[in-house]
Design a protein with these regions (language model features):
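Bacterial Sec-exported substrate-binding components of ABC uptake systems
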Residues: 2-66, 172-207, 272-281, 298, ...
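Short helix-initiation/N-cap motifs at beta->coil->alpha
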Residues: 44-46, 102-112, 243-255
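A short, structured surface patch at a secondary-structure boundary
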Residues: 61-114, 118, 122, 126-129
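Proline-aspartate-enriched helix->loop->beta-strand connector
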Residues: 116-125, 145, 258, 263-268
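Charged, glycine-enriched surface loops/patches
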Residues: 135-172, 279-301
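Ligand-binding pocket segment of bilobal, Venus flytrap-like solute-binding proteins
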Residues: 195, 225, 245-275
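Alpha-helical, coiled-coil/dimerization segments enriched in small aliphatic residues
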Residues: 215-251
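Structured C-terminal subdomain patch of bacterial secreted/periplasmic proteins
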Residues: 261-333
Length: 333
């Protein structure tokens, strides 16, 4: 039985239990009975919000979109999420295409009339706190309870997705996906443990700017690194100056700084696109003479990783599969 099939077997029972008991989340949220619907108080980025225990009509935006699609939440509307389409399974992509779009890619592109027409009993906003300023929160709150649960640092997607799933009444589904991911990560850690022992890794991400002559250096806890870390990879170093959020774990040095930035690396991973090819910003690094002279490159310890922007446990399984495929040559050494 697949993780998704398992979810469907237990989802109805879990929701029924939640309504009967009016239980709070594992975060200690309180619960109460209001009219015919059980409610609880949920701690969100925008404060303590009273929400249904078992939401029946959910609108999701931003990072909450893939999370709640995977969790089989009772979605009636979502924002556009084109950046994550390549990470979706065929089943999730079909769900994404079927659902009404009530907002664009940016928070400012919220269609309030479309949100109201969806008649939600819960709205889950999955955008960073600074982006909330682009949303008319009072207008949304006049439609349904609104919980803002947005990203902070790249590796925080684990807790972010847990909270979003919890708000939508799908905590059990989330747990099943989490356990499947952790099992796979443990398998890879065991499989490659000996080969990875003692190796210091660096990572090149895909957001360098060719026009400015910079490359994207990612450290532990960044998009390109955090999932590989769960498989046993150790990334060394840190940013010169923390800038908050993702800038705490990533920086953009000039390409001339490649020897300084990655010269101590025993091995290097780099982000590739879903089709396995590097984006232009990565290709400019790989084509550089400075890159070719790095010790890790000369030693043949460079590995392209797909799906490094995964922000859900289900999609991160694809990242782990890519890690497994990329590291296979290490076992032949």
């Amino acid at each position: 039985m697949s993780v998704r099939q398992h979810w469907r077997v237990i989802a109805a029972a879990a929701v029924t239990l939640a309504v009967v008991t009016g239980c709070g989340s594992d975060g200690g949220d309180s619960a109460a009975k209001s009219g015919d619907a059980a409610t609880r108080v949920f701690a969100a980025d925008n404060g303590d919000i009273t929400i249904p225990v078992a939401p029946q009509r959910v609108v999701a935006t931003g990072y909450a979109v893939p999370v709640l699609i995977e969790a089989d939440a009772a979605l009636v509307g979502i924002s556009s999420w084109k950046r994550g389409l390549a990470l979706m399974t065929e089943q999730d992509r079909a769900t994404y295409e079927r659902l009404p779009k009530v907002a664009g890619e940016a928070a400012a592109e919220t269609n309030y009339e479309a949100v109201a027409a969806a008649k939600p009993d819960l709205i889950v906003i999955g955008v960073p706190k600074p982006a909330l300023g682009s949303i008319d929160m009072k207008r949304l709150e006049s439609i349904a309870p609104v919980v803002a649960i947005g990203p902070t640092t790249p590796a925080a997607w684990r807790e972010l997705s847990r909270r979003q799933s919890d708000a939508a009444g799908r905590g059990t589904n989330f747990q099943a996906a989490k356990e499947a991911y952790e099992k796979r990560a443990a398998e890879l850690k065991d499989k490659y443990g000996a080969a990875l022992t003692g190796l210091k890794f660096g990572h090149v991400g895909s957001y360098g700017e060719i026009a400015k002559g910079t490359f994207h250096r990612e450290f532990a806890g960044s998009w390109g690194t955090n999932i590989a870390q769960d498989a046993g990879v150790t990334y060394y170093g840190e940013v010169k100056e923390k800038g908050g959020g993702g800038l705490d774990v990533t920086e953009y040095p000039a390409i001339e700084e490649l020897p300084t930035s990655l010269g101590e690396a025993d091995a290097i991973t780099y982000t590739v696109q879903p089709d396995g090819t590097p984006a232009e910003a990565v290709k400019q690094v790989l084509d550089s003479a400075l890159w070719k002279n790095l010790p890790a490159v000369k030693a043949g310890r460079v590995f392209g990783l797909q799906y490094t922007e995964a922000a859900t446990y289900e999609s991160a399984l694809r990242t782990l599969d890519s890690v497994d495929k990329a590291f296979a040559p290490l076992l032949a050494r």
